[in-house]
Amino acid sequence: VNTVKITVGIDIGGSTTKIIGIRGDEIITPMIVKANDPIASLFGAFGKFIDQNALSLGSIERIAITGVGSSHVDKSIYDIETIKVQEFLCNGYGGLHLSGLKSATIVSMGTGTAIVRACNGDIEHVGGTGVGGGTLLGLSNRMLNIREIDLLIETAKDGDLSNVDLLVSDISRDVLPTLPSKSTASNFGKISDLASKSDIAMGLINLVFETIGTLAAFAARSSSTNKIVLIGNLTTIPQCHDVMRALEAIYPNEFIIPDHAEFGTAVGAALSLIKK
């Protein structure tokens, strides 16, 4: 029987709650629960985590909570010491731990987007954007009548951006040394009557990821490292990888999506207590 106690990190986000346990150097099966009510999703996630990992309440030493929903929690969970941790710190700790880096620009892509600069133990919030998962679902709901992210991803699979976006090659015959001809000159700047549902779905995903990736590249310019670590729910969208790879041809950055990236903030919450 493992007697080392577990530190639990819970990230109560805008649309989902993520939970993860850390015992020594081991990450215990992370889980995600969808819920609109922060308290319901907190206890739902915690109960599921305890049950599916066959844990007892006594095996848990402390619980770290973070995320926008943590403001609704004002007492300990099942009499276990419960500590609120600032979300930006969690993003930094989690991003560095999952990527194995000592310093990086960490981008948390959830309902909106937050960017921190992390160097060893120093975490600095540098900004963000309201463009994120909420933008993606809001626009896809209005433009395509699609309200589920999985359906949007599936619809976008065969999408052709050249029916939606204006590319550099569409407006310039000259080769620009710092701008590949396939780069976007204007998102949705060339939308044609021939654009299919798939094309528009891909255009929306591309718009959101290009905006986030470009902002991250600018934020990283004043950093000592060119590495950008992506965490949060949006990292699970397959097209994220492709869009960021294309941005690497324009900017001097390396975009990294580590394993368990969607749980980065929850991991950071648990680590913030362990570091103490």
Q: How would you name each of these model-derived features?
A:
Residues 65-72, 218-247, 262:
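Glycine-rich phosphate-binding loops at beta-strand->alpha-helix junctions
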Residues 122-176:
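Glycine-rich phosphate-binding loop plus the immediately following alpha-helix
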